[in-house]
C-alpha cells in the first residue's frame, strides 16, 4: 500500500561555507534552514558578555503586568512571561553586534536572495531572549504579522527572516524549538498532523536557524536548571518599519559603522522596485530626494573614541 502522506526529510543543515543559493532554496521550500557555526565561539563569548548585565537587570526589575482588558494598545515590555528575560537594541551597547553581526557576509548573501522581489532590507530588531528554568511551552505561532496592505499566504513574498541564533545549548532538557514541517505552505496557522509533523530542532552555541515568517513554530519547556539563551536577528524588507528604533544613537557612534551596517539601522537610503517594475530600483528614505547619508555628510568606518584613546595610550 502506498502512503498518501507527504514525505518530510527534516530541516536541512548547512555550514558557514555552504552555497547561499542552496540555503535560500531550503528556506523557500521548507520555511526553515539551519547553519551550523554561523557565529564563531569568540563571537558567542563576546555577545554573551555584552548581554549578561542587561539581562540580569531585566530579571531583577519589578515587571509591570499591564491590565489591557479595555485598552487595545500594548507594549511588548508589559507582556514578557515569567522566567523570561529579554533585551533589545543590541546596536546600542554591543560592539560585536554593531560591527560583526550587522556585516555578516553570509547573512547578507541570503537576505539579498530572499528580498530580491521587494528591494533592500534592514534590521527589524536585534535582541537576546533568555528562558530560565520553568519556562513553559509557547503557543503555536508565526513571526510574520498580518498587515492589511501586505499580501499574505504561501505565495506571498517573504515578509521577514529571523536568524534565530543560539548562544547556549538548545537540547532535550533546555528545550528545542518546535517547527511544524510544511506549515509554510499552508494559509491557516494549523496544527501538526500526519502530513505536517513536528520537528524538534537542537542547536549548539553559534548555530542559527533561519526562520521564515511563514513557518508555524513554538518554543519548548525548559526542564533543566540552566538558562536557554538565543539571539533573534530579525531582518525585514525596508518597506516595513523596524521594531527597534535607532533615532537615539549618537552620530559619533553611527559613524564608526560601515555604510552597510548604517543602512541596516536606517541611517542610509534604501532601494526598492520602482512602481510597475521589479527590474528598476528607486531610492526611498531620502533627503532632498537623494541618498540620506550623503546629503547629511555622514561618515563611516571612523575609529571609535575609546579605540583612539587606547591607541594613543600605548
UniProtKB/Swiss-Prot annotation:
Q: Name one GO biological process term.
A: indole alkaloid biosynthetic process
Q: What Pfam families would the database entry show?
A: PhyH
Q: Is the Oxidoreductase keyword given for this protein?
A: yes
Q: Which UniProt keywords apply?
A: Alkaloid metabolism, Dioxygenase, Iron, Metal-binding, Oxidoreductase
Question: From what superkingdom does this record's organism come?
Answer: Eukaryota
Gene3D superfamilies reported for this sequence:
q2cbj1_9rhob like domain
Family under the similarity heading: Belongs to the PhyH family.
For this entry, the protein name equals: Dioxygenase easH
- Species of origin reads Claviceps purpurea (strain 20.1) (Ergot fungus)
Query: Gene symbol?
Result: easH
